[in-house]
Swiss-Prot record:
Gene name linked to the record: GPD
Protein name: Glyceraldehyde-3-phosphate dehydrogenase
Superkingdom per UniProt: Eukaryota
Binding site for NAD(+): R12, I13, D34, R79, N315
Pfam families tied to this protein: Gp_dh_C (PF02800), Gp_dh_N (PF00044)
GO biological process: one example: glucose metabolic process
UniProt cross-references to InterPro entries, sorted A to Z: GlycerAld/Erythrose_P_DH, GlycerAld_3-P_DH_AS, GlycerAld_3-P_DH_cat, GlycerAld_3-P_DH_NAD(P)-bd, Glyceraldehyde-3-P_DH_1, NAD(P)-bd_dom_sf
Reaction it catalyzes: D-glyceraldehyde 3-phosphate + phosphate + NAD(+) = (2R)-3-phospho-glyceroyl phosphate + NADH + H(+)
Keyword Acetylation: no
Enzyme class: oxidoreductase
């Protein structure tokens, strides 16, 4: 059975969730809401993409609907989530991808329009967070609004799980070298809450805060309080990399760590975590559907208890694929697929 989905917010993640749903199948987007983007502009934005290239299928506007690959998608322009007629369009699940309605209270407004469940494509202060391959066994169908966590948490958590399960993590620090996102400034501008964040992304490396490492403690409770981290925003369009430094409980050679990751890649984390020994750079991972790609040739060990591990992720494409995967999973558990 196909899961019918609505998208609130036709930004980077909203559009790429649709592209991934078309690729992965099993999920059909039947409605889109965005009060700031008219239908003809939606066609243009979906067709052309500076990172992932031109959409190879057909996309057009017809009779007030967005037609992608021959399938009609209802289009709404409501500012209030409670006013979006999801039920009338057949959408059971809603992807909240505006980055605005990220709490349970705000996201749950979608239920008033007929949605059965909301998946927030961002970290949430109070909604339960789920990371595919890590804590889906903790899924509670009774919760109407859930979070897919952040792209960085989706990269870090699977790797941290493998290392923690096999060797134990005493403590760790993470840095993410993160590609540009839509909220950053092209030229220096005002940013009262984050002064450095107001500086031009085009010619700067910008230190920034991130809750991604701490959030791992929410999806892997035994790591709660053991990880924290920061971010450096860099002037690239897509693909980011996690640099994880950990102290291990059990001694392990770097070869033993590589073997543990390989085992997980071939087993329980297949499709989520990947492994490479090739001498790759960031653009080589554009369009990669994995949450995390362990770079075996980039990591180093100081000794058998202290190691630096490197993992890449397409913070747009890989994350959007996990949104689709999470929808598929919860629909099955909810009995709607």
């Amino acid at each position: 059975m196909v899961v019918k989905v609505g998208i609130n917010g036709f930004g980077r993640i909203g559009r790429l969730v649709i592209r991934n749903a078309l690729e992965a199948q099993g999920v059909e987007v039947v409605a889109v809401n965005d009060p700031f983007i008219p239908l003809d502009y939606m066609v243009y934005m979906f067709k052309f993409d500076s990172v992932h290239g031109r959409y190879k299928g057909t996309v057009e506007a017809k009779d007030g609907k967005l037609i992608i690959a021959g399938k009609p998608i209802a289009v709404f322009g409501e500012r209030d989530p409670a006013s979006i007629p999801w039920g009338a369009s057949g959408a059971d699940y809603v992807v909240e991808s505006t980055g605005v309605f990220t709490t349970i209270d705000k996201a749950s407004a979608h239920l008033k329009g007929g949605a059965k469940k909301v998946i927030i494509s961002a970290p949430s202060a109070d909604a339960p967070m789920y990371v595919c391959g890590v804590n889906l066994d903790a899924y509670d169908p009774r919760r109407p609004s859930i979070s897919n966590a952040s792209c960085t948490t989706n990269c870090l958590a699977p790797l941290a799980k493998v290392i923690h399960d096999k060797f134990g993590i005493v403590e760790g620090l993470m840095s993410t070298i993160h590609a540009t996102t839509a909220t950053q400034k092209t030229v220096d501008g005002p940013s009262n809450k984050d002064w450095r964040g107001g500086r031009s992304v085009n010619n700067n490396i910008i230190p920034s805060s991130t809750g991604a490492a701490k959030a791992v403690g929410k999806v892997i409770p035994s790591l709660n309080g053991k990880l924290t981290g920061l971010s450096f925003r860099v002037p690239t369009l897509d693909v980011s990399v996690v640099d994880l430094v950990v102290r291990l409980e059990k001694e392990a050679t770097y070869d033993e760590i590589k073997a543990a990751v390989k085992e997980a890649v071939a087993g329980p984390l297949k499709g989520i975590l990947d492994y490479t020994e090739d001498a790759l750079v960031s653009t080589d991972f554009t369009g990669n559907t994995h949450s995390s790609i362990f770079d075996a040739s980039a990591g180093i060990a100081l000794n058998k208890n202290f190691v630096k591990l490197i993992a890449w992720y397409d913070n747009e494409w890989g994350y959007s694929r996990r949104v689709v995967d999470l929808i598929t999973f919860v629909a099955q558990k909810d009995g709607n697929a």
